[in-house]
């Protein structure tokens, strides 16, 4: 792809469009999620997050039984789901009292007029120890949610 940026012509290789630094965070239930940056590709978009767990139990940022709980949302309220099948449990599980960085890929085909307004984590498992002991996962109810507004340049 050839783009014109700040009066300069640039060539994007391997469908890479560009990077944007964001550094915006949101906190709920003693969990802070910071959106560090995003990389845009022709067929998808990645976001790098720093997740801080100040709880006394490990958390899981994605319910593995439901695919649609991590997404990005555009200005038209369209949701683009995360590629959760590419994430290992070690990517989404944050131990108590620790900060972890994870890069998450989303289904989001490039468009020059697409504006991503939010990243969302709708079903954070706030007590992974308790969750992992449930034989009936549907009975577990200790969930959190964080939605982070993406500033527009």
Say what each PLM segment does.
Residues 31-37, 85-90:
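Short structured motifs
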Residues 52, 64, 74, 85-86:
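Low-complexity, intrinsically disordered/propeptide-like segments
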Residues 49-58:
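Asparagine-centered strand-capping/turn motif at beta-strand->loop junctions
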Residues 25, 38-41:
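Short, conserved, surface-exposed binding loops centered on an aromatic residue
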Residues 41-48:
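Short, solvent-exposed loop/turn segments enriched in Ser/Thr/Gly
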Residues 1-33, 59-80, 92-153:
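Surface-exposed edge beta-strand/loop patches
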């Amino acid at each position: 792809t050839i783009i014109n940026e700040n009066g300069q012509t640039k060539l994007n290789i391997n469908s890479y469009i560009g990077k944007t630094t964001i550094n915006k965070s949101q906190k709920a239930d003693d969990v802070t999620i910071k959106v560090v940056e995003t990389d845009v590709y022709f067929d998808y978009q990645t976001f790098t997050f720093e997740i801080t767990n100040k709880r006394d139990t490990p958390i899981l940022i994605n319910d593995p039984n439901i695919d649609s709980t991590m997404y990005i949302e555009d200005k038209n309220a369209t949701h683009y789901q995360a590629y959760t099948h590419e994430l290992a449990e070690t990517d989404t599980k944050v131990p108590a009292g620790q900060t972890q960085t994870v890069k998450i890929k989303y289904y989001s085909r490039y468009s020059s007029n697409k504006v991503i307004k939010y990243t969302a984590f709708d079903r954070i498992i706030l007590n992974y120890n308790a969750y992992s002991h449930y034989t009936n996962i549907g009975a577990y109810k200790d969930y959190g949610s964080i939605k982070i507004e993406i500033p527009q340049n």
